C-alpha cells in the first residue's frame, strides 16, 4: 500500500466517518441547512417577482437569484466550518484520548488530514445536496454551468481554508472553546474585516487623492481578494469590478479570483503545516 493510499484510507479516517455520519443529527443538520437556503431563496424569488418586469422573473432576475444563493451558501459555510473543525484535536485532548491516538502508527500528517477531511466531508455533502435548488436558476436562464462551477469552487476553497485554520487553532490551543473563538475571529476578519478596511480607509485615500494611482488600486485589491463574497460577485459580475478597479493608465486590473486562489491556498498549506508540526511538539514529526 503506497503512502498516498495510507494517507486517505486509514483507521483514523474510517472512525471519524462513522462517528460523523451514523448520527441522525447529522442528517437533520443537512435538512435544516437546505431548509434555510431554500426558504431564503424562495423568499428572494418572491421579492424579485414583485419588482420584475410585469411581475415575472426573467433571465436578469434569475441571475440575481443565483448571486443571492451563492452568497447565502458562503455565509452558511463560513459560520458552520469553525464549529466543525475547531474542536478536532483539542476535543481529543480534553477527552484524554489524544495521547492514545499519538501512540498509533499513524503519522502526524495522516491524523491532521484525516480530521480535516472527515469534518469537511459533512459540509461537502450539504453543498452538493443544494444542487437541486439551483434548478430554480436554470429554469429561468441567465446563468451558465461555468458560473455554477466557479461559485462552487469559491465555496469549497473557502471551506477548506477556514477548516484548515480551525484544525490549526485546535492543535495549538488546548481548550476547545478558545479554539472556536479564535477560528471565528479569523473567519470574520477574512469575510467581513477585509471589506470594512477597504470601505473605511479606501474612501479616505480617495478623498485625499482625486486621481488615485496604482497604490490605491493595489490597496483595495489586496484586501478584497481575501473576501469570498466579494470574489464571488467579481466572478459572476466581472463588468462591475472592471469599472471599480479601472485606473487611468492601467488595465482593468488583475482578476480578483487569482489573488483569492493563491492567497487561500497559501493560508491552507501554512495552517496545515503548523498543525502537523505542533501535533507532536516534543518529538520529531513522522509525517
Question: Can you annotate each of these PLM segments?
Answer:
Residues 1-31, 280-284:
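Aromatic- and glycine-rich beta-strand/loop motifs that create alpha-glucan
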Residues 47-52, 56, 188, 192-270, ...:
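Terminal transmembrane helical anchor/hairpin motif
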Residues 13, 88-121:
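Helix-loop-helix units of permease transmembrane domains in multi-pass membrane transporters
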Residues 67-91:
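Long, hydrophobic alpha-helical segments
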Residues 36-40, 122, 126, 130, ...:
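Alpha-helical transmembrane segments of multipass membrane proteins
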Residues 25-49, 74-78, 183-193, 269:
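Hydrophobic alpha-helical transmembrane segments of multi-pass membrane transport/permease proteins
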Residues 66-70, 75, 118-174, 182:
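Secretory targeting signals
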Residues 81-85, 133, 165, 271, ...:
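Hydrophobic/aromatic residues in alpha-helical transmembrane segments
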Amino acid at each position: 500500500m503506497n503512502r498516498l493510499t495510507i494517507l486517505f484510507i486509514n483507521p483514523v479516517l474510517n472512525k471519524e466517518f462513522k462517528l460523523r455520519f451514523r448520527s441522525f443529527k447529522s442528517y437533520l443538520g443537512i435538512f435544516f441547512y437546505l431548509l434555510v437556503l431554500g426558504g431564503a431563496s424562495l423568499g428572494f424569488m418572491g421579492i424579485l417577482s414583485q419588482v420584475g418586469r410585469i411581475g415575472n422573473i426573467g433571465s436578469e432576475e434569475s441571475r440575481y437569484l443565483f448571486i443571492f444563493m451563492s452568497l447565502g451558501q458562503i455565509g452558511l459555510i463560513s459560520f458552520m466550518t469553525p464549529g466543525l473543525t475547531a474542536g478536532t484535536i483539542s476535543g481529543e485532548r480534553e477527552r484524554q484520548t489524544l495521547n492514545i491516538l499519538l501512540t498509533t502508527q499513524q503519522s502526524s500528517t495522516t491524523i491532521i488530514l484525516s480530521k480535516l477531511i472527515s469534518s469537511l466531508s459533512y459540509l461537502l455533502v450539504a453543498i452538493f445536496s443544494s444542487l437541486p435548488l439551483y434548478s430554480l436558476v436554470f429554469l429561468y436562464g441567465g446563468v451558465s454551468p461555468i458560473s455554477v462551477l466557479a461559485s462552487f469552487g469559491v465555496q469549497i476553497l473557502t471551506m477548506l481554508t477556514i477548516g484548515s485554520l480551525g484544525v490549526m487553532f485546535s492543535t495549538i490551543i488546548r481548550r476547545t472553546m478558545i479554539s472556536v473563538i479564535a477560528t471565528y475571529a479569523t473567519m470574520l476578519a477574512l469575510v467581513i474585516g477585509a471589506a470594512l478596511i477597504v470601505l473605511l480607509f479606501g474612501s479616505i485615500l480617495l478623498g485625499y487623492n482625486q486621481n488615485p494611482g496604482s497604490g490605491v488600486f493595489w490597496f483595495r485589491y489586496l484586501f478584497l481578494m481575501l473576501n469570498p463574497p466579494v470574489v464571488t460577485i467579481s466572478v459572476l459580475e466581472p463588468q462591475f469590478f472592471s469599472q471599480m478597479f479601472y485606473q487611468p493608465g492601467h488595465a482593468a486590473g488583475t482578476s480578483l479570483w487569482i489573488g483569492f486562489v493563491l492567497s487561500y491556498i497559501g493560508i491552507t498549506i501554512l495552517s496545515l503545516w503548523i498543525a502537523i508540526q505542533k501535533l507532536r511538539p516534543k518529538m520529531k514529526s513522522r509525517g
